[in-house]
Amino acid sequence: MKRFRRLGLLLIPALALMVLASCAPKKIYIPVISKGFQHQFWQTVKAGAEAAAKQYGVTITFEGPPTEADIQPQVQMLVNDMAKNPSAIALAALDTNAVMDQLNQAIKRKIPIIGFDSGVPNAPAGAIYATAATNSYNAAGIAADHMYDALKDKITAATAAHPVTIVDFNQDATSQSVTDRGKGFRDEMIKKIEADGKHTADDIRVIGNPAFIAPDTPTKGKAITIDVQVPATPKDPDSAVSAQAILNRVKKDNIIGIFCSNEGTVKGILASTADGTALPKNYPGMAVIGFDAGKNQKAAIRAKYFMGAITQDPYNIGFQAVDLAYKAIKGQSVANVDTGAKWYDSTTMDQPDIARLLYD
């Protein structure tokens, strides 16, 4: 009897530990799935996500496919992460349709999903709790404003007999952020042209990739062409091929400006112009505006080969994605966060409020 009593006394602490362990809060795990790793932009997003994870004491993983053309590898990453029973997921989807099954599973399992960067457009209702992203449409509009101001004399002087072309160069026609930028640049440029009093929509035509041509987009004008170009794939070599094709017809089509809507298309132009050094010599007077940052783009802007660029705040995008995920896990109300965008050029890129946004 004493032996059983002694055994019982020994079991009590063990049972108590088991009860306490079962009552311990589940460790918060948030996988952060980006669109790729081919651009330094994503490394800066990662740094922001890791900072938020440290602040809240949560575990995250940060992963993405090799390039932004690799849709299926990203789908598999999401499948694998959902099998680990995450507390929430932060996702920048390459293709919402490709992850529709996983989004519906997340709804059933009550796993909050936070979109970031391009987010998860057209997701099922209730799947996405909030999104941390730049307002890409408005950001590209800033680029159009600066390009118009720089080229105003050439644009207002354009006629059917002496037309001009402005290229709207986009990495793909599927990503929400990229397509929003392409459309934002297109629309703001049209608005500025119509406001100059010299031209109407009847003088403008938008050509190129059909994803960027809306039913109300002017397509028949002969004085000013906005040419929307998209490479065969988002991979860097294809962006370079497309960039070279654009540059080959600068003289024939009287291309006076090129807007590159992300780091990928910027790389294409830089690869085709010896990091921009050939621009002033071979294409004098042509304005080039970029997007985001990166060592080579920054150098091209500092040297005035590029007019300037639009910078996002990739660190804040990553931080806010994890911040929103944590708050959603805790049952707090969350809402979309506009992480901001700013214009910079050789005269402003060293200002503290700009310099902190410009990654290498």
What function would you assign to each model-found segment?
Residues 1-11:
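Bacterial N-terminal signal peptides that target proteins for export
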Residues 19-22:
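C-terminal motif of bacterial Sec signal peptides marking the signal peptidase cleavage site
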Residues 3, 24-360:
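A residue-level marker of the well-folded mature domains of exported/periplasmic proteins
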